[in-house]
Amino acid sequence: MKLGVTLESLGLPFRRGLAEVRRLGLAGIQVDAVGELSPDRLTDTGKRELRHLLRSNGLELTALGCPLRHGLDEPENLQPRIDRVRQVMSLSFELGARITIVQAGRISDAADDPRMPFLRESLLALGQHGDRTGATLALETGLESGESLKTFFDTLDTGGLGVNYDPANLLMNGFDPVENLAPLKDRIVHTHAKDARRARVSRAAMEAPLGGGDIDWMQYLGTLGALEYRGWVVIERETGTDRIADVAAGVAFLRRLV
């Protein structure tokens, strides 16, 4: 397994972020395709410069994130969101990552859920775009069980869909992050290393520094390895007052385990 970090966890602009990732001794970085890195703003010259900056820092792009204000299950103004994701997928292929991460919306087991046809058709179209271009759209885990997500994938005739497995998201939504790995073993193309504490009577579930939450990382990483996952394990820290220090501590923590 290869270790990386999300640029957004560092709270730094792109160039300074690359230098910090190199200082931390990590091999990869995930970046959101927003601002100057947005597909509609990144020129061919910009793409060449981005690839050069990555190479000069000895880094690989692990994936592009594609933040959406609304999921792909929301019918209002849906087509522009589909087009946006499609553009980011194509950009991810051009930049060598080939993986785009998206929070698509909740996958419901209810046959009469009115949002599901929109989600299904959107993801089928995007997955088939991935089939044609060699890119993969990775759905972020957390809102449904691994078995529910697998069952949903099995209804779609495309190999262009995968999973970004985020154990903390699952834990905070009441799912066991280890038990839910196996159903998705053939779909996991990218993973986040993020920790969390379970909800208690006196508090809500919350993110925690890596190694400071309720996830059994030795068991989790051991299970990932047993399932023959050899891809990226990318540290993500979304809260905290000193996230760079938390990331550095997380790097040291993971290196003791992988």
Question: What is the meaning of each model-derived region?
Answer:
Residues 28, 99, 190, 231-232:
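Residues at the N-termini of beta-strands
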Residues 3, 28-29, 61-64, 121-214, ...:
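Acidic/histidine-rich catalytic cores of soluble enzymes
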Residues 1-93, 158, 251, 255-258:
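N-terminal pre-domain/capping segments
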Residues 219-220, 225, 232-233:
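H/E-rich (His + Asp/Glu) clusters that bind or coordinate divalent metals
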Residues 13-19, 53-56, 60, 70-163, ...:
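Active-site acidic/histidine proton-transfer and metal-coordination neighborhood
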Residues 6-10, 32-34, 66-69, 105-107, ...:
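Active-site beta-loop-alpha junctions enriched in small/polar residues
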Residues 42-49, 78-86, 112-123, 175-180, ...:
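Charged helix-capping and loop-helix junction motifs
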